[in-house]
């Protein structure tokens, strides 16, 4: 698949209750740059010709103003009444003609290993054996290295990065464009896709590092990834 036919959706509308005073989490500085700029730099390196769609919500104007002009920005004005699925759905509307969609949550700090092994020929999820907190969603992986189910209280963790194409992309659109799913989490939609016959390869190796920034302690841990 040509990279020109790939869209990267970065859902970044949520408040982040424990870090609200920091403003939009993608603008938190980690190392010499912000979370979102670190993400974009890596994504532009490894998926150079893709289209990037940033979905804003909490303090949307500030986030839009402090991110590069070459990315597309849309606003989930109902961010405080809905969940990430509505933001993903809005990103999909802006990516209508793409053959593949990568989703990267907007509060992640990760290294190049987290994205450079993604194949654009098959839907997949990135597994994080290091970095993600115990409270994050874990994975049940089948003997064929395909994802069976996502649920809490399991290891290894889903790294909140996924790629969708073919049947899985069509199911993602159908589910995210259904209003009754607006309050769902992303992992619930992935489970729904699997239940409807979709399949996700699991990308995992011990060099992948991903941290979901949920506290000030996570910021210090994230700096070590970028060293």
Per-segment meaning from a language model:
Residues 12, 31, 56, 105, ...:
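Short beta-strand/turn micro-motifs composed of small residues
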Residues 1-21:
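N-terminal nucleotide-binding beta1-loop-alpha1 segment
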Residues 111-188:
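Conserved core of the sugar-phosphate nucleotidyltransferase
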Residues 63-138, 142-143:
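Conserved beta-loop-beta/alpha segment of the NTase-like Rossmann-fold superfamily
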């Amino acid at each position: 698949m040509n990279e020109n036919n790939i869209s990267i959706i970065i859902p970044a509308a949520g408040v982040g209750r424990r870090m609200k005073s920091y403003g939009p989490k993608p603008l938190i500085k980690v190392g010499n740059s912000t979370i979102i700029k670190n993400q974009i730099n890596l994504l532009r390196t490894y998926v150079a010709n893709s289209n990037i769609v940033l979905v804003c919500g909490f303090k949307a104007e500030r986030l839009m103003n402090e991110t590069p002009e070459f990315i597309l920005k849309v606003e989930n004005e109902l961010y405080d009444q809905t969940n990430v699925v509505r933001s993903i759905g809005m990103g999909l509307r802006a990516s209508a003609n793409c053959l593949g969609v990568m989703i990267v949550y907007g509060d992640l700090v990760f290294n190049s290993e987290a994205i450079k092994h993604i194949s654009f020929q098959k839907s997949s999820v990135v597994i994080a054996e290091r970095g993600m907190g115990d409270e994050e969603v874990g994975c049940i992986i089948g003997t064929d290295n395909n994802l069976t189910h996502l649920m809490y209280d399991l290891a290894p963790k889903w790294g909140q990065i996924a790629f969708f194409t073919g049947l899985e992309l069509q199911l993602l659109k159908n589910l995210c464009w259904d209003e009754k799913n607006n309050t769902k989490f992303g992992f619930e939609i992935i489970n729904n896709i699997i239940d409807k016959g979709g399949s996700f390869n699991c990308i995992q190796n011990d060099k992948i590092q991903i941290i979901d920034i949920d506290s000030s302690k996570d910021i210090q841990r994230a700096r070590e990834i970028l060293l």
